[in-house]
């Protein structure tokens, strides 16, 4: 593995930390801002090769997140040691999520995932599993200048919004679960996201979309 590979995984690791923090989990600025030298020192072998087992981490919801999303629970992030996710790899990951009572699991892999492995994901319900290819996390898409701010609403906020504007869920514009920002935030079916955009004429304005 070259130093370029280590650089790549360092970027992926930092974006994963940012993602977890943006979902409302307790991640320190020090973790998010880990330098490349620190990454090599803490996560790599003497030859500079990243040890993916060392990169795995768990996080707990922040007090603010628990207040807004009481059902949130802990999250586990795992970096797959195999290049591709097989049924065996996914089964072991599902067992780890279930046995340790994680509410959410994130599996980051290098190349691809077999359809059979993907079909195992619902087996951990009521826990949920999100999967990302390493290239998905090379950059944080939410920091792109053209991507507006997305904020996930709580159940209470959703109820208030629908009642205030006398709306039915079917009347709201939609955002697909496969949307890159929806995946980043971990949006689930039926959840609403508030999207804040800037306008040269009207300043900031908000719109809402429901995840399907």
UniProtKB/Swiss-Prot annotation:
It is found in: Nucleus. The keyword Metal-binding does not apply. Pfam families: RNA_pol_Rpb5_C, RNA_pol_Rpb5_N. Transmembrane segments: none annotated. Gene3D superfamilies: RNA polymerase, Rpb5, N-terminal domain (3.40.1340.10), RPB5-like RNA polymerase subunit (3.90.940.20). Belongs to the archaeal Rpo5/eukaryotic RPB5 RNA polymerase subunit family. This is DNA-directed RNA polymerases I, II, and III subunit RPABC1. The lineage of its organism: Eukaryota, Fungi, Dikarya, Ascomycota, Saccharomycotina. The gene is RPB5.
